Amino acid sequence: QSKLKNSTPVQKSKLKKRLSPLRYPGGKSKLIDQLLPYIQDKECFVEAFCGGSSLGLALLDAGKIHKLVLNDLDRNVYAFWKIVCSNQYKELNDKILEYSPIKETYFAYQERLKSSDLSDLDRAFYFLVINRCSFSGIQMANPKSDMKDRWIPKSLTERIKKIHSMSDYIEVRNNDAMELIEEMYWNPKNCIFIDPPYIEKGDQLYPVKFHLHQELAELITDLLREFPGCADLLLTYDDQEILHQLYNQNH
């Protein structure tokens, strides 16, 4: 990511960079123009760690791909996208229009998300409230003092309605990322976007922990070395020395 930001300026595309209603630490909306040249002539874009999915949604909306796979092991993220792509999106939008954020409900929703008994609809709504009203969209964070500035019902519901209009071309999954990568790799018409949690601060930012950076590096390099010519793999990371070691030793 750091290298992309510091690279030679690229021509701005007409892709919509703000389709997602989610705010995400490490989101790639600002890097869409830099990433676009690496995604050409592919039918399906697979997001192994989808999060807010700003890149995948922009590609689908622009007709650059014909199918989008949104995968996230975080059950809150999964429930949100599942509801947005189902007929229950209308009920979610009703909840959004009726809600006015206050700290009391923020903390109550944050606590309820820990329960395994929530319906997908409630989980999706609570998650959206926390995501929009917390610092940087971090699920475990405290609410921002200006919560209402981030909660704009009309804008949120319009984005959700827009995404739902593309739902025939979206598949939502709740799989282990490395299992999904291995499954999707064999189709040369796929581009698999691998954007794992930050190495340095991932535990502070995401409720679902991911410590398998070495195993991920081994999987990626093994697939590319032993079985070239299959899906394209697009990998983004925070620039850490350990990454250079992992990918150099596995090259």
Residue map of PLM features:
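Conserved S-adenosyl-L-methionine
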Residues: 38-104
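Conserved beta-strand signature within the Rossmann-like core of class I S-adenosyl-L-methionine
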Residues: 230-236
